[in-house]
From Swiss-Prot:
PANTHER family for the chain: COLD SHOCK DOMAIN CONTAINING PROTEINS
GO molecular function: DNA binding
Principal location listed in the UniProt entry: cytoplasm
Binding partners and assembly: Homodimer.
Keyword Electron transport belongs to the record: no
Residue stretches in coiled coil: none
Name this polypeptide is given: Cold shock-like protein CspB
InterPro entries listed in its UniProt record: Cold_shock_CspA, Cold_shock_domain, CSD, CSD_CS, CSP_DNA-bd, NA-bd_OB-fold
Paired cysteines (S-S): none
Gene designation: cspB
Organism per entry: Bacillus cereus
Entry annotated with the keyword Lipid metabolism: no
């Protein structure tokens, strides 16, 4: 799936991804597929999978586009 980062708090290490016609999806820094510091920028395009977490759907295998 593809979406845009709605917001991401670098200090806390989480945020949300928005998709057209769907609810926002929680994203944790541990789901970001990159080397080094794992963070996302507001408005950044990403691809991801959705898994079922403890508190509902969350992003997995997040890659910056």
């Amino acid at each position: 799936m593809n979406g845009k980062v709605k917001w991401f708090n670098n200090e806390k290490g989480f945020g949300f991804i928005e998709m057209e016609g769907s609810e926002d999806v929680f994203v944790h820094f541990s789901a970001i597929q990159s080397d080094g510091y794992k963070a996302l920028e507001e408005g950044q395009e990403v691809s991801f999978d959705i898994t079922e977490g403890n508190r509902g759907p969350q992003a997995a295998n997040v890659a910056k586009l």
